[in-house]
Amino acid sequence: IIYIFLVYRLSIKTKIFSFILIICLIYPTFLTLNNDYKHRYFSDIRLIIGENGLKNYLDNSTYGSHRNVAKEIFLDNPLFGVGIKNFRFESANEKYDNLEHKYNHKRVSNHPHELYYEFLSETGIFGLICFLIFIISSISLSLKNYLKHRNIYQLSSLIFVCVSILPIIPSGAFLSTMVSSIFWINYAIMIGYNKVNKN
């Protein structure tokens, strides 16, 4: 959707109206067709907008239990974590059976559903620092290049990459899912235009 709005020369009013219309058509349809998603969506929204907001959500959801065990895994393995794609095994370790969380019994998952918890638990502080240096320097270089050449494809990929690394936003397994494929495609476009514009 972002590509369409950036590429086609439409007035800002038309873009905003089109975006709202698309969301208003797609979202309710998706909720209607998938009962599990609908239930999860509305129960999560109730927790977030209720008293104590985000804290309440993290204390009373399975995602909160994933983050809680990820934090404990990181504290047990602070430098290098437990290894890429090993959260699924380590979260099932019986030493985490007695963590204080309402849904601790549902803590076992393929990944912690949040980028920074995933990096901290699987690669430790070393892996997270390496990733941050790598991604921030890439974004900085691409932003400078965009400001110089104003390439809208690079801008849309830059926006996608920046939004994908925002803290607290739930995410898929960053190193092994379709979500990560989409991220790396956008990253490649973002970086690729740096080289194109130098030639």
Each language-model region and where it sits:
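Transmembrane alpha-helices of multi-pass inner-membrane enzymes
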Residues: 1-5, 24, 131-134, 157-169, ...
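Membrane-interfacial segments
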Residues: 37, 41, 142-150, 174, ...
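Hydrophobic transmembrane alpha-helices and their immediate junctions
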Residues: 6-8, 14, 122-165
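Transmembrane signal-anchor hairpin modules in multi-pass inner-membrane enzymes, especially those
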Residues: 12-17, 148, 194-199
